[in-house]
UniProtKB/Swiss-Prot annotation:
UniProt cross-references to HAMAP family, sorted A to Z: AlbA (MF_01122)
Modifications the protein undergoes after translation, according to the UniProt entry: Acetylated. Acetylation at Lys-12 decreases DNA-binding affinity.
Keywords per UniProt: Acetylation, Chromosome, Cytoplasm, DNA condensation, DNA-binding
GO terms of molecular function: double-stranded DNA binding; RNA binding
Keyword check for Membrane: no
Protein name (database record): DNA/RNA-binding protein Alba 2
Classification via InterPro entries: Alba-like_dom_sf, DNA/RNA-bd_Alba, DNA/RNA-bd_Alba-like
Role: Binds double-stranded DNA tightly but without sequence specificity. Involved in DNA compaction.
Family: Belongs to the histone-like Alba family.
Organism: Saccharolobus shibatae (strain ATCC 51178 / DSM 5389 / JCM 8931 / NBRC 15437 / B12)
Subcellular location field: Cytoplasm; Chromosome
Length: 89
């Protein structure tokens, strides 16, 4: 699966703080909107990343949209969540 420049797919190999740092780096590079994607068991980790970002940045971050759904992978349905975050100046 190809990732967009502003999309971060939450994976089990990285911890929550690494994903938080990735989002902050993207914001510091000038990207105003980032999409966090949690797939399957990593849905709760994606929500944890958002909550940690909200704790660190406070009102500097805004949750624009939350989208849930499922996609077919290897003939199985896998749930996902998309969290669209926007940097507020």
């Amino acid at each position: 699966m190809t990732e967009k420049l502003n999309e971060i797919v939450v994976r089990k190999t990285k911890n929550v703080e690494d994903h938080v740092l990735d989002v902050i780096v993207l914001f510091n590079q000038g990207i105003d909107e980032v999409i966090l994607k949690g797939i399957g068991r990593e849905i709760s980790k994606a929500v944890d990343v958002y909550n940690s970002l909200k704790d660190r940045l406070g009102d500097g971050i805004q949750l624009v949209n939350v989208q849930t759904g499922s996609e077919v992978r290897d003939r199985r349905r896998i749930s996902y969540i998309l969290l669209r975050l926007k940097r507020v100046y």
